[in-house]
C-alpha cells in the first residue's frame, strides 16, 4: 500500500505550481478589471477566491505531513474556509475585499518569480545562505557551507551508503551552495537553506498589502522600510539560530515527546523541530504582529485589510484605529468593509 505522506507529496508536486499560477493570474486579471468594470471584476475575483481555497486545501497536508509544520499546517487548513468566506462576502457587496484581492495578486507577483525562475531562486537562496554563514561566524564558529550534492556525498561516505543511494540522495535538492554541514559525535547533520527559508513569503505578504492600498508613495515607502528590511534581517537571525541549534544539537528538549509529536525516529531531528517548528515559528507569529503594528502606524490605509481579516477569522468587528491609536486614513479611500461598515 502506498505511503500516505508520499501520496500527499506527489499530489502537491503535481498540482501546487499550476494552481498557484491560476490563482495569481485570476487575482491579477480581476484586480485590473476592477478599474474598468467592478461588477464583472467581482465575479472573476469570487472565482479566484474559490481556486485559492483549493490551493490551500492542497497545501495543508503538504505542510502538516511532509514539512511537519504545525503552524503552517493549521494555517493552511484555516485558509480553506476563510478563502471561501471571503468570496461569499465579496459576492454580497463587501467592497473592501477588493483591496485584499489586489493584495493577493501583488503577493503572487512578488513571490512566484522566486519560486519558479531558477536563476532568481538560486540567487536569493545562496545570498541568504552566505549571510547566514556570516552571522554564524559572528558567534565565533566556522561553518561549513557547501553545495547540497557535496553535502549529500559527504553524508553518504560517513554513513556507508551505496553509490546509487548516495546519488539518489544528492538529487533531493538543487545544486546550490546552500547547505551547512556539521558532524556531531561522528554523525553528519545538514541544514539546507531553501526558498522557504529566505523570508520571501512574509516579505511578499507585506509588499502585497502595501501595494494594494491607495495611499501616497511617501507613506508606502515608510511602511516598506519598517517591514521588508526588518523581516529580511530577522530571518537571517532565525536561520543562524536554527543552524547552530540543530548542527550542534543544542535543542534536545523532551526528545521522546518531540519525536512522537513530529513522527520521527531520528533523535537528532529533535533539535531541528524544537528550534524551527516550535521556537522560530512561534516567535515569527509574534514578530509579524509587531511588524503589522508598525506598518499600520505608517500606513493607516492597511487597517481595512487587517480589520477584514480579523472579522473573517473571528466573526467579530474590531476598531483597529482606536486600539492602536493611529490616525484615520483618507476617507476618500474608504470602502465597504467585510462587516458592512463604510457603506453609504
Specify the residue positions occupied by each region the protein language model found.
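Hydrophobic N-terminal alpha-helices or hydrophobic patches in metabolic proteins across all domains
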Residues: 1-344
Amino acid at each position: 500500500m502506498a505511503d500516505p505522506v508520499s501520496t500527499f507529496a506527489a499530489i502537491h508536486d503535481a498540482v501546487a505550481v499550476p494552481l498557484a499560477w491560476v490563482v495569481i493570474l485570476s487575482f491579477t486579471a480581476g484586480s485590473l478589471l476592477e478599474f474598468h468594470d467592478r461588477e464583472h471584476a467581482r465575479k472573476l475575483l469570487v472565482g479566484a477566491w474559490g481556486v485559492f481555497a483549493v490551493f490551500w486545501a492542497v497545501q495543508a497536508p503538504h505542510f502538516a505531513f511532509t514539512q511537519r509544520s504545525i503552524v503552517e499546517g493549521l494555517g493552511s487548513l484555516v485558509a480553506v474556509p476563510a478563502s471561501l468566506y471571503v468570496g461569499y462576502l465579496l459576492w454580497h457587496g463587501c467592497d473592501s475585499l477588493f483591496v485584499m484581492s489586489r493584495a493577493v495578486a501583488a503577493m503572487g507577483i512578488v513571490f512566484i518569480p522566486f519560486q519558479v525562475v531558477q536563476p532568481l531562486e538560486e540567487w536569493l537562496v545562496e545570498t541568504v545562505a552566505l549571510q547566514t554563514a556570516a552571522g554564524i561566524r559572528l558567534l565565533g564558529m566556522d561553518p561549513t557551507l557547501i553545495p547540497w550534492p557535496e553535502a549529500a556525498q559527504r553524508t553518504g561516505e560517513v554513513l556507508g551508503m551505496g553509490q546509487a543511494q548516495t546519488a539518489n540522495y544528492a538529487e533531493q535538492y538543487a545544486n546550490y551552495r546552500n547547505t551547512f554541514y556539521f558532524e556531531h559525535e561522528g554523525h553528519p547533520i545538514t541544514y539546507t537553506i531553501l526558498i522557504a527559508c529566505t523570508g520571501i513569503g512574509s516579505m511578499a505578504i507585506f509588499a502585497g498589502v502595501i501595494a494594494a492600498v491607495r495611499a501616497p508613495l511617501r507613506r508606502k515607502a515608510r511602511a516598506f522600510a519598517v517591514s521588508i528590511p526588518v523581516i529580511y534581517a530577522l530571518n537571517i537571525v532565525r536561520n543562524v539560530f536554527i543552524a547552530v541549534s540543530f548542527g550542534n544539537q543544542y535543542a534536545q528538549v523532551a526528545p521522546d515527546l518531540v519525536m512522537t509529536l513530529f513522527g520521527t525516529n531520528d533523535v537528532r531531528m529533535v533539535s531541528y523541530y524544537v528550534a524551527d517548528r516550535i521556537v522560530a515559528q512561534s516567535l515569527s507569529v509574534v514578530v509579524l504582529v509587531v511588524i503589522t503594528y508598525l506598518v499600520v502606524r505608517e500606513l493607516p490605509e492597511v487597517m481595512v485589510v487587517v480589520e477584514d481579516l480579523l472579522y473573517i477569522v473571528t466573526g467579530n468587528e474590531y476598531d483597529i484605529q482606536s486600539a492602536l491609536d493611529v490616525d484615520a486614513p483618507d476617507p476618500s479611500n474608504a470602502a465597504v468593509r467585510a462587516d458592512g461598515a463604510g457603506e453609504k
